[in-house]
């Protein structure tokens, strides 16, 4: 993963995403995870590093542990998922924010399909959203409809 991150930086990428090693998290190899994130962050600096944790595959305690590790290792963002494993819920965001507060930025991917969901997550402190094309169109239509009916 370190080699790929360096290659992506050299290729001109503006930011880097990496997926947290869930197997190591579930096996309790927490120092290994922190070291890996720290090494990649050092290699791609000053580019922003987003660490994806796939919250739908983790227990509440694992989400809290992963959030702490990501923050401690110096990443710029916690990203809740790739968008493929399932929907991020308000409960997932609560767990992350309860653990790290506003000390690190949060990006949600997966499950943002309505304007109300987006607004609620934004009010909870989510700074970025990964939204699929169809959902983005639907959310924009909701915005337009609300604006024209108010």
Regions found by a protein language model. Name each.
Residues 1-43, 48, 55-63:
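Active-site beta->alpha loop and helix N-cap motifs at the rims of alpha/beta catalytic domains
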Residues 1-7, 58-69, 93-98, 102, ...:
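Catalytic cores of alpha/beta
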Residues 10-25, 72-89, 110-114, 122-146:
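Glycine-rich phosphate-binding active-site loops on the catalytic face of alpha/beta enzymes
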Residues 25-32, 37, 61-65, 69-70, ...:
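Generic alpha-helix signal with a bias toward terminal, lower-confidence helices
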Residues 28-55, 72-73, 87-114, 146-150:
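Alpha-helix-loop-beta-strand connector modules within alpha/beta enzyme cores
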């Amino acid at each position: 993963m370190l080699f790929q991150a360096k290659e992506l930086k050299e290729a001109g990428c503006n930011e880097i995403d990496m997926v947290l090693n869930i197997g190591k998290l579930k096996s309790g190899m927490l120092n290994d995870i922190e070291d890996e994130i720290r090494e990649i962050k050092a290699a791609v600096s000053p580019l922003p590093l987003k660490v994806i944790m796939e919250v739908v595959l983790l227990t509440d305690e694992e989400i809290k542990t992963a959030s702490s590790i990501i923050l401690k290792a110096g990443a710029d963002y916690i990203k809740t998922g790739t968008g493929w494993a399932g929907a991020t819920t308000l409960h997932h965001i609560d767990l992350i924010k309860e653990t790290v507060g506003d000390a690190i930025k949060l990006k949600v991917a997966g499950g943002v399909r309505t304007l109300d969901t987006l607004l609620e997550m934004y009010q909870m402190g989510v700074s970025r959203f990964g939204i699929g094309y169809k959902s983005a169109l639907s959310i924009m239509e909701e915005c337009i409809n609300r604006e024209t009916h108010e």
